């Protein structure tokens, strides 16, 4: 059974305060997921890190390149971890474990799912169950035409109402060859945004 750093009892019931903040990093189906390893390394120098990857992100993300102390969870772990009543449910355990969540990159598809309340994979189940008194950051990555699409504007408005913090994309040459806005912010910018806004009082690990 896939578990989050030891038993669920230790996570939820012992009330121990971690020395470092607990950060859940997530990657979705964008070519910018090739930078996820760099993001994990940056955060793991400061925080206790766990990672979640959607099925599509695995086309770009090299699991073997992640830091050894960063456990990566996928949809397969969600479905293999529950056997009977009383077993921990992975997306709930991760929701309780994390003090902060960062989705980088956030694809247009996953943005639409979150805005619509869908929960059809491990990541979107965590977001649907998220305690919005705890910080949740997103760093979108998509083609310029998708970024400027009216649907994207609506979806960003919806997640803003939930209190989700946007780390805006940047303008550069995109993977498709187009030049424009839509590239994920650099990992250093994402890290600095989260680190500078961090308040120790947010550390609770109990959801």
Task: Give, region by region, the residue ranges found by the protein language model.
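A cross-family phosphate/adenosyl-ligand binding-site feature
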Residues: 1-138, 143-207
């Amino acid at each position: 059974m896939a578990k989050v750093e030891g038993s669920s009892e230790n996570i939820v019931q012992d009330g121990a305060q971690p020395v470092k903040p607990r950060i859940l990093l997530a990657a979705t189906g964008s070519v910018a997921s090739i930078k996820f390893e760099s993001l994990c390394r940056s955060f793991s120098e400061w925080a206790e890190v766990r990672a979640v990857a959607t099925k599509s992100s695995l086309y770009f993300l090299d699991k073997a390149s992640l830091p050894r102390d960063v456990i990566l969870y996928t949809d397969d772990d969600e479905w293999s971890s529950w056997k009977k009543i009383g077993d921990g449910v992975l997306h709930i355990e991760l929701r309780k474990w994390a003090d902060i969540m960062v989705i980088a990159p956030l694809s247009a598809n996953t943005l639409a799912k979150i805005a619509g309340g869908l929960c059809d994979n491990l990541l979107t189940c965590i977001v649907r169950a998220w305690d919005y008194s705890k910080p949740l950051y997103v760093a979108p990555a998509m083609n310029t035409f998708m970024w400027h699409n009216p649907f994207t504007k609506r979806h960003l408005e919806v997640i803003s109402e939930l209190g989700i913090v946007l780390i805006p994309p940047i303008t550069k040459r995109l993977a498709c060859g187009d030049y424009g806005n839509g590239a994920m912010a650099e990992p250093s910018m994402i890290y600095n945004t989260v680190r500078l806004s961090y308040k120790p009082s947010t550390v609770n690990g109990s959801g």
